[in-house]
A protein has these predicted regions:
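Flexible "arm" and connector segments at domain edges
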Residues: 1-66, 70-103
Length: 103
């Protein structure tokens, strides 16, 4: 499982590296250069596509759209200068509590 987690770490590292690339040559740099609204719109779009795939019970499409969603979430985090550790720390703080909501 840890090698799978490392994939997420490498994804964010790649996004960080590409954030300074030429936006005409890097999709990641293009998204980041277009501002927070574009990043937010892409997360919204990919979340909706993931939900639609789930409604259709299309397992392969759920996996595909989930990967897109995770990528775009990472780009959004970068746009707001967040690191995966910020999110992991929040999740860790919720461990062992009733429900997922931090009250």
């Amino acid at each position: 499982m840890s090698s799978k987690i490392n994939t997420l770490i490498r994804l964010f590292e790649t996004i960080e590296k590409r954030s300074n690339d030429d936006p005409t040559k890097s999709y990641t740099a293009q998204l980041l250069s277009e501002g927070k609204e574009k990043c937010i719109a892409k997360v919204r779009e990919e979340a909706l596509e993931t939900v639609e795939a789930a409604e259709q019970e299309n397992i392969s499409q759920i996996v595909y759209e989930s990967a897109d969603l995770i990528y775009h979430l990472h780009v959004l985090w970068k746009k707001f200068d967040l690191k995966p550790d910020d999110i992991y720390s929040e999740l860790e703080s919720r461990e062992g509590k009733t429900g997922i909501k931090n009250e």
